[in-house]
Regions:
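Terminal interaction helix/tail motif
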Residues: 8-11, 15, 108-158
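Short amphipathic alpha-helical/adjacent loop interface patches that line ligand
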Residues: 12, 19, 37, 59, ...
């Protein structure tokens, strides 16, 4: 690993740690979301209703793990299953109105924290950072597509 790789790895570790702190700060008040619940809820909000197998594949998790996490969302009233219109033998998971509201509150809190952190950045720096972060995520997706990443409990390991 060269010096740049070492710096990047360190900064990613710091970023993960700080993102956990931001996540934990959203757990104040009446509703708290586990990291896994937040991820599943974002996937459903952004991509629409999905079968559990598709959710498991999206996160690189075993279907039994997703099933447990989904059960928690259903028990909390944040998600519900309906019959899949394309195959009546299967079901799809979607957010409930309550789940959408809770997710939006959590996302709003996260956006506020990001705005605070980035308030002194120039427009150009923000644009560059967004572009580079998108490129990084695309590169990580390519690795995952080749099975070079293992996702466990919401964390990615190479």
């Amino acid at each position: 690993m060269n010096t740049d790789d070492t710096k990047i790895e360190r900064q990613l570790t710091v970023l993960l740690r700080k993102s956990v702190r931001i996540h934990l700060s959203t757990q104040r008040g009446d509703v708290s979301l586990e990291r896994s619940a937040y991820g599943i809820m974002c996937q459903l909000a952004d991509e629409g209703p999905q079968r559990l197998g598709a959710l498991a594949a999206a996160f690189g998790l075993d279907p039994s793990t997703i099933t447990r996490q989904v059960r928690d969302l259903e028990n909390a009233g944040f998600a519900s299953r309906q019959t899949d219109p394309s195959d009546r033998r299967a079901s799809v998971l979607d957010l409930t109105p309550c789940g959408r509201q809770v997710l939006e509150q959590s996302r709003e809190h996260r956006r506020f924290k990001l705005q605070e952190a980035l308030s002194n950045w120039s427009s150009r720096d923000l644009s560059d950072f967004g572009r580079l972060l998108q490129e990084f995520n695309t590169s990580m997706d390519r690795l995952a597509a080749f099975g070079l990443l293992l996702c466990t409990n919401g964390f990615v390991f190479g």
